[in-house]
């Protein structure tokens, strides 16, 4: 609404007005993402750019920060992954087998890097497939949902097209751990937690 220069959301004549709490939460999120400076305030340059992306504001902010931090190639993979249901399947009757199969994708430092490992593994499998039937069989043997992997690729393709329309370029060199996580945190500030490594007795 801000980007369209419409009246303040609190005064707009909605058929069914949103709850005041929802409006407050929305403004708080935009402030967190640096899209506005204050509740009811005008869009910042960051906010104006985010308004051009028909995406969840958090995802849009991650992608924008990734373009600035030379991490867009990696964040496209992660943003599309967290937009769908996890493709890793964990059937109740085969949880140990699924965990063992998924171990090859695990990264000790970051769950986000695990998603990149999984993406690279699936892309390699697709590039070297002998047939679609054998490829799908390989995915199922590794407890991966064929349907969700397809959704992941579709969302990735859509996000990549959007970023190209924005004029953002993919980084040619792999992003560092710091570049990647700095970009991701731009959209996840409200989700940060602190781990206390000292046991409390």
Which stretches of residues belong to each language-model region?
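Second RecA-like catalytic domain
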Residues: 1-201
């Amino acid at each position: 609404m801000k980007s369209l220069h419409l009246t303040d959301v609190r005064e707009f004549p909605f058929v069914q007005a949103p709850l005041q709490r929802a409006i407050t939460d929305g403004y708080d999120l935009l402030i967190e993402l640096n899209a506005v400076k204050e509740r009811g305030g005008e869009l910042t340059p960051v906010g104006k750019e985010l308004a051009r992306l028909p995406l969840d504001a958090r995802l849009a902010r991650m992608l924008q920060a990734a373009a600035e931090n030379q991490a867009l190639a990696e964040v496209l993979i992660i943003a599309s992954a967290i937009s769908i249901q996890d493709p890793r399947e964990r059937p109740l009757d085969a949880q140990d087998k699924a965990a063992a199969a998924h171990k090859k994708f695990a990264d000790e430092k970051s769950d986000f890097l695990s998603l990149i490992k999984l993406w690279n593994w699936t892309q390699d499998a697709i590039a070297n497939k002998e047939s679609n039937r054998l490829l799908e069989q390989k995915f199922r043997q590794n407890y991966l949902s064929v349907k969700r992997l397809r959704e992941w690729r579709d969302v990735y393709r859509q996000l990549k097209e959007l970023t190209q329309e924005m004029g953002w370029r993919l980084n040619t060199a792999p992003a560092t751990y710091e570049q990647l996580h700095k970009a991701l945190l731009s959209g996840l500030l409200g989700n940060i937690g602190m781990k206390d490594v000292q046991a409390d007795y």
